[in-house]
């Protein structure tokens, strides 16, 4: 089946084409494999929903956690939640049945929502990357919670403006069963191809280029800072310092080392998110361009299998983010333990006073311009 309408309404494509409907036995994927992929996708829905919900709850319930960067992370989590709820269940059902049971109009709507929430997530990741660049490289920490909220609102509007034309008919959409989800289809019309290029560039290639340049600059700055701190420590003549001066210098060195360690750890967390985004979305971006421009690829026997793999990989990003948070962010792990019912908490909680004795670095508290990452 295929659904499509033109940008100017001067021609119409066939909305329903029975000849494109595949029987379950005709799909390149065997029934056990389809069911396994669907079950894995259902697990991804559960993990992605619960993990990202915890992020939103932490930021909502704790005023101290409502820094600019944490508001951005909560927005990223919310976009992943909506992607898990609005798109993934229908793809899982279609994987099992090899038929789209929700109509061609809802197919186009689901594809629009898919691109909408993906665009928002990418926009937030891009904003976080630029913010880290300004803080570490340019030493400009101008993003406060108020500005972050304004930028978040603007990103939602921009994501909607870019994704909405796909619902109104600015590109050709393929309805399953040729793919397990409504995807960009092959077209020879220049306007439709131009929109596909715009969409893919906005989702992946432009953000990837900006983030890659930002991270390379950050890596270079962090390396230089580490060398400078090390050289300053080696060049000191402690015999020329008084007792008070020595204590003050040691405090300055400790603070500089702590700030460098904090920024490096925060940057490493964001860098891991960037790597996950790149691995999950590079195949999908190439696949989308080939679908729109290559007739041979689009009508090949392997198109259904390729569609299933790249869609499954793109959804994996929604699960990847909360796993990274749990792995890298101590406050996130602590909040997860606190949110668990008491019957599931195996280890008793250590009082904060004792934690400070065990780990003196816990006295370092982030201000509102720093994050828990």
UniProtKB/Swiss-Prot annotation:
Extracellular side: 1-38, 97-109, 171-198, 291-306
UniProt topology in membrane: Multi-pass membrane protein
Record keywords: Cell membrane, G-protein coupled receptor, Glycoprotein, Membrane, Receptor, Transducer, Transmembrane, Transmembrane helix
GO cellular component terms, semicolon-separated: membrane; plasma membrane
Transmembrane intervals: 39-59, 76-96, 110-130, 150-170, 199-219, 270-290, 307-327
SMART domains: 7TM_GPCR_Srsx
Gene3D superfamilies, per the entry: Rhodopsin 7-helix transmembrane proteins (1.20.1070.10)
Taxonomic superkingdom: Eukaryota
Tissue expression from the record: Brain specific.
Compartment(s) of residence: Cell membrane
MF annotations from Gene Ontology: G protein-coupled receptor activity
Pfam family, one: 7tm_1
Alphabetized PROSITE patterns for the sequence: G_PROTEIN_RECEP_F1_2
Cytoplasmic side: 60-75, 131-149, 220-269, 328-373
Parts forming coiled coils: none
InterPro entries: GPC_Orphan_Receptors, GPCR_Rhodpsn, GPCR_Rhodpsn_7TM
Positions glycosylated per UniProt: 17
Record family assignment: Belongs to the G-protein coupled receptor 1 family.
PANTHER family the UniProt entry points to: G-PROTEIN COUPLED RECEPTOR, G-PROTEIN COUPLED RECEPTOR 45-RELATED
Purpose of the protein: Orphan receptor. May play a role in brain function.
Protein name from the UniProt record: Probable G-protein coupled receptor 45
Natural source organism: Mus musculus (Mouse)
Chain's gene name: Gpr45
């Amino acid at each position: 089946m295929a659904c499509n309408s033109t940008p100017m309404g001067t021609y119409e494509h066939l909305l329903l084409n029975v000849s494109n409907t595949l029987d379950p036995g005709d799909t390149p994927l065997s029934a056990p494999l389809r069911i396994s992929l669907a079950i894995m996708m259902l697990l991804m829905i559960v993990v992605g929903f619960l993990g990202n919900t915890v992020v939103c709850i932490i930021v909502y319930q704790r005023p101290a956690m409502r820094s600019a960067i944490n508001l951005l992370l909560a927005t990223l989590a919310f976009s992943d939640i909506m992607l898990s709820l609005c798109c993934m269940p229908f793809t899982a059902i279609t994987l099992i049945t090899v038929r789209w049971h929700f109509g061609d109009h809802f197919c186009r709507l689901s594809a629009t929502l898919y691109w909408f929430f993906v665009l928002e997530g990418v926009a937030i990741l891009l904003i976080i990357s630029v913010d880290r660049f300004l803080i570490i490289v340019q030493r400009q920490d101008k993003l406060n919670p108020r500005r972050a909220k304004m930028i978040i609102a603007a990103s939602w509007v921009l994501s909607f403006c870019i994704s909405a034309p796909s619902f109104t008919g600015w590109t050709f959409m393929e309805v399953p069963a040729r793919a397990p989800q409504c995807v960009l289809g092959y077209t020879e019309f220049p306007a439709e191809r131009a929109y596909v290029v715009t969409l893919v560039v906005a989702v992946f290639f432009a953000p990837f280029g900006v983030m890659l340049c930002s991270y390379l600059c950050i890596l270079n700055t962090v390396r230089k800072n580490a060398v400078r701190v090390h050289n300053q420590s080696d060049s000191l003549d402690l015999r020329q310092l008084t007792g008070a001066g020595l204590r003050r210098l040691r405090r300055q060195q400790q603070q500089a080392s702590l700030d460098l360690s904090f920024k490096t750890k925060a940057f490493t967390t964001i860098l891991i998110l960037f790597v996950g985004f790149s691995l999950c979305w590079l195949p999908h971006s190439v696949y989308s361009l080939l679908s729109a421009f290559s007739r041979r690829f689009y009508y090949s026997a392997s198109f259904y299998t390729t569609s299933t793999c790249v869609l499954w990989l793109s959804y994996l990003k929604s699960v990847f983010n909360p796993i990274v948070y749990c792995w890298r962010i101590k406050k996130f792990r602590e909040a997860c333990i606190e949110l668990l019912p008491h019957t599931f908490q195996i280890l008793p909680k250590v009082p904060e006073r004792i934690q400070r004795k065990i780990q003196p670095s816990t006295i370092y508290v982030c201000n509102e311009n720093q994050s828990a990452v």
